[in-house]
């Protein structure tokens, strides 16, 4: 019964997201993209973890493509009494309430060797996880980006992002599914305003300690971009390795 209620609430939240997206919509139809991605995770200890993300984006109408390489290090603390699998975990663990992440992102347009788009970014994130009744997890993420855009004489800017996300784990045998919904506004120093908002709904499915599949649908509105509206299908393969278990 709880699972059914959660699914109903998740569906309602997703519906509200699409209605909000439609209300923001302009005259031009939204662009459509696919975002395949491979995320590799290496756990060094119960609190330290490294990761490498390789996402690619492709516009289904113009065939424009971008690729990124993301390197990250995580430190978690504030152990709780809750055991659960998070979206980016291979299995259920005792959850830490706080997580600090630092990383680097390098990105380029793929068909012109970076002429249309080149980015180098250093970023830091602070995560706070708040368990709610019924097994629902509410998480806050605050992220700060230091960005260098363009080749050669690159333009420096900063960006602040805040993400609010709700998720809940369901289990069946050895399998685990974690549906989620999130909203994330972006503040860009180039425009001195919140110019972008992302609305996401999806799920992560794990069946072993080595792999999980995550898929989501993203709606993005950006008031300062040539592509003001965007719908994207994101499919992520998570690969997990645990060096702490060999010690």
Predicted regions and their residues:
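Residue-level signature of outer-membrane beta-barrel architecture
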Residues: 42, 75-77, 92-93, 128-130, ...
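Transmembrane beta-strands of outer-membrane beta-barrel pores
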Residues: 54-60, 104-110, 130, 144-148, ...
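Repeated loop/turn-to-beta-strand initiation elements of outer-membrane beta-barrel proteins
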Residues: 47-52, 79-84, 95-100, 133-138, ...
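Transmembrane beta-strands of outer-membrane beta-barrel proteins
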Residues: 37, 49-55, 72, 86-87, ...
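Detector for outer-membrane/organellar transmembrane beta-barrel domains
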Residues: 135-184
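Residues that define the transmembrane beta-barrel architecture of outer-membrane proteins
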Residues: 32-34, 65-69, 118-122, 154-160, ...
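Short glycine/proline- and aromatic-enriched beta-strand/turn motifs that initiate or cap beta-hairpins
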Residues: 25-68, 238
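Outer-membrane beta-barrel "beta-signal"
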Residues: 73-75, 126, 229-247
């Amino acid at each position: 019964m709880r699972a059914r209620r959660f699914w109903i609430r998740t569906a309602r939240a997703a519906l509200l997201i699409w209605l909000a997206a439609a209300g923001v919509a302009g005259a031009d139809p939204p662009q459509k993209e696919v975002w395949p991605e491979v995320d590799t995770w290496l756990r060094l200890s119960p609190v330290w973890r490294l990761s490498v993300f390789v996402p690619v984006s492709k516009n289904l109408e113009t065939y424009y493509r971008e690729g990124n390489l993301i390197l990250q290090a995580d430190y978690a603390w504030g152990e709780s009494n809750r055991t659960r699998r998070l979206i980016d975990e291979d299995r259920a663990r005792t959850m830490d309430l706080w997580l600090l992440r630092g990383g680097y992102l390098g990105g380029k347009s793929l068909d012109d060797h970076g002429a249309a788009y080149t980015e180098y970014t250093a970023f830091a994130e602070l995560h706070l996880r708040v368990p709610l009744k019924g097994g629902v997890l509410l998480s806050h993420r605050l992220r700060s980006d230091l960005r260098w855009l363009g080749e050669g004489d690159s333009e420096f800017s900063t960006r602040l992002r805040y993400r609010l996300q709700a998720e809940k784990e369901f289990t069946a045998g050895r399998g685990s599914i974690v549906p989620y919904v999130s909203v994330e506004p972006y503040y860009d120093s180039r425009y001195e305003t919140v110019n972008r908002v992302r609305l996401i709904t999806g799920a992560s499915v794990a069946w072993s300690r080595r792999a999980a599949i995550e898929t989501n649908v993203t709606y993005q509105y950006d008031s300062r971009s040539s592509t003001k509206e965007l719908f994207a299908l994101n499919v992520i393969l998570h690969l997990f390795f645990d060096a702490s278990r060999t010690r």
